[in-house]
Regions:
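A cross-family phosphate/adenosyl-ligand binding-site feature
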Residues: 1-122, 126-193
């Protein structure tokens, strides 16, 4: 049975690898969603450092894992239909590659395809503080059609744990693809508590 939706998840080596991991975990629980992932070599190191996840465990999360260097992969072509791509976390290096159309590896190429095909591209940029160069890159990709969504937690939901905070933030990112994970405590619901 073909999936109703395909979504690409890119995971870079920036701090915050849990966002990409949680995204793949959440999407695995939703029927009809097929995940395609491209993971940078640095992301495997970050996963080991930040969340004690082995490369084997990380590789097992998506439905389809594409090689970081495979520019000929299905997701490198506009004819391969997807809902779009979430890059979580997104490093400044990756942001720069996307902003400058410098697609020397699959993660940036897949993002570039989303932009040229006018598909959703959400970048969870993990950098702070920002200088003018970072802001210029964010402006460039936004003008090209991307959405910059830094993983800023919502406190109105009164998260009881870091896990809840991460799930809520990833749920908000997936809202942008019209995928409801059930993890987002909506504003009016939070006010009722």
């Amino acid at each position: 049975v073909p999936a109703d939706k395909r979504i690409i998840v890119g995971i870079t080596g920036a701090s915050g690898v849990i966002y990409g991991v949680r995204c793949l975990q959440m999407l695995r629980e939703i029927e009809g969603v097929e995940t395609h992932a491209v993971i940078s070599p640095a992301a495997f190191l970050t996963a080991q450092t930040e969340i004690d996840m082995t490369s084997q465990e990380l590789r097992a999360l998506p439905d389809v894992l594409h090689s970081f260097r495979d520019i000929g992969a299905s997701i490198a072509s506009g004819s391969f239909r997807t809902e779009g791509m979430l890059v979580a976390p997104c490093s400044v290096k990756t942001l720069s590659g996307i902003a400058n159309c410098y697609a020397d590896q699959l993660l940036v190429r897949a993002a570039d395809v989303c932009l040229k095909e006018r598909r959703r591209l959400v970048l969870m940029l993990r950098e702070t503080p920002l200088h003018a160069g970072h802001i210029a890159l964010m402006s460039t990709v936004t003008q090209a059609g991307a959405i910059i969504m830094p993983p800023v937690p919502a406190f109105y939901s009164r998260p009881a744990s870091l896990d809840e905070m991460v799930s809520h933030t990833v749920g908000r990112a997936l809202d942008l693809f019209d995928i409801d994970t059930g993890a987002v405590k909506r504003w009016k619901d939070a006010q009722a508590d």
